[in-house]
């Protein structure tokens, strides 16, 4: 019985980390496919948007928390067709933006359950 419990706790510890990394990896891929043209690969500037979107003194801070950023992305991004990306993909790309900004760390998951508690400065 002790072995079974140990195995269960070990699996619980492993799979969330993998799932968290999967969300970040998905966000990175979505950003590369849908966001790079306008915002640039480094979030600093692209063909359509010349203002950096993450980092010190950038536009991302105006959203105050992760939920505000997600809601903006949900309604308006990508600019050429917000319906091109489903809700889980928008959570993933929002996580990617927040990790690049330093508001979240790799290994964390972003969802409606925790987004309002994650400040953006």
For each predicted feature, which ranges?
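Flexible coil segments in periplasmic/lumen-exposed cytochrome c-class electron-transfer proteins
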Residues: 32, 82-121
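The canonical Cys-X-X-Cys-His
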Residues: 27-42, 93, 97
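Bacterial N-terminal signal peptides
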Residues: 4-14
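Electrostatic cytochrome c docking/interface patches
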Residues: 13-30, 81
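Gly/Gly-Pro-rich "capping" loops immediately C-terminal to redox-active cysteine motifs
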Residues: 28, 42-78
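Extracytoplasmic/periplasmic, Sec-exported soluble proteins
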Residues: 22-23, 61-65, 85, 89
């Amino acid at each position: 019985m002790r072995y079974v419990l140990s195995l269960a706790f070990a699996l619980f510890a492993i799979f969330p980390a993998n799932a968290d990394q999967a969300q970040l990896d998905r966000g990175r891929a979505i950003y590369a496919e849908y966001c790079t043209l306008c915002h640039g690969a480094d979030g600093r500037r692209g063909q359509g948007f010349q203002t950096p979107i993450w980092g010190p003194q950038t536009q991302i801070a105006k959203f105050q928390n992760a939920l505000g950023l997600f809601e903006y992305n949900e309604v308006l991004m990508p600019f050429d067709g917000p319906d091109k990306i489903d809700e889980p993909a928008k959570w993933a790309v929002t996580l990617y933006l927040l990790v690049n900004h330093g508001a979240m760390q790799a290994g964390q998951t972003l969802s409606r359950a925790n987004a309002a508690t994650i400040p953006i400065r």
